[in-house]
């Protein structure tokens, strides 16, 4: 039995889950949800969410604040005064499980950050390393934010899918960081950000014509300097 089987999902309660553009478009497509139904921006002035991994985005309505694009949180139905991932499905606590058991409501479409936890690729990029999980995901003493009920073991991880997931996660986050560099040169309103994402990813597949295409402002030829151009392009 894996660590998640009887867990209350402390990780899904403790952390703001960073998204990539691919995560966002997959959730929109597969679950038929709109961006505004599941995505939000989390202010991250000290880098505690990005952790030198997810990119920071700047927006014209608050240009001094670095934000990370994440899944929304909502109030827990059973653990008063705590929050959880918007997609976490909770069961009521019982005698065997004082904090209940919880499951991901979008497991097949879950973001790359969720697929990767608590793993990483080694320095060669060929092997999976299990990271040590701390006892708690947030400061304080609320048991809702306690993490895995036992240490992870290699037998808990699928040796095929884990490597594949981690390689894709690394690639998509790298692409998203480059996308953030382009966006941050001319930050626009948060309100047009999903249109920008759809525009970029719609142009992600190209027919090769001579020299390779560099990922810069020219990669998104319709990306103008004002919000109206973004809306019309998308």
Regions found by a protein language model. Give the residues of each.
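Short loop/turn segments that flank or connect secondary-structure elements
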Residues: 1-234
């Amino acid at each position: 039995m894996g660590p998640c089987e009887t867990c209350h999902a402390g990780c899904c309660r403790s952390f703001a889950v960073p998204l990539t553009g691919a995560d966002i478009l997959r959730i929109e497509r597969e679950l038929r949800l709109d961006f505004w139904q599941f995505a939000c921006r989390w202010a991250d002035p000290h880098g505690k969410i990005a952790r030198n991994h997810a990119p920071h985005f700047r927006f014209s309505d608050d240009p001094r604040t670095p934000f990370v694009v994440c899944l929304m949180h909502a109030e827990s139905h059973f653990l008063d005064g705590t929050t959880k991932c918007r997609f976490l499905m909770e069961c009521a606590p019982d005698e065997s499980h004082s904090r209940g058991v919880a499951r991901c409501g979008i497991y097949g479409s879950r973001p790359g950050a969720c697929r990767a936890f608590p793993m990483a690729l080694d320095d060669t990029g060929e092997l999976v390393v299990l990271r040590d999980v701390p006892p708690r995901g947030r400061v304080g003493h609320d048991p809702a934010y306690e993490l895995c009920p036992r240490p992870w073991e290699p037998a808990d991880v699928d040796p095929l899918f884990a490597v594949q997931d981690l390689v894709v996660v690394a690639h998509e986050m790298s692409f998203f960081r480059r996308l953030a560099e382009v966006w941050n040169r001319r930050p626009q309103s948060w309100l047009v950000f999903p249109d920008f994402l759809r525009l970029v990813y719609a142009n992600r597949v190209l027919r090769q014509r001579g020299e390779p295409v560099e990922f810069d402002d020219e990669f998104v030829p319709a990306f103008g300097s004002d919000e109206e151009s973004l809306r019309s392009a998308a």
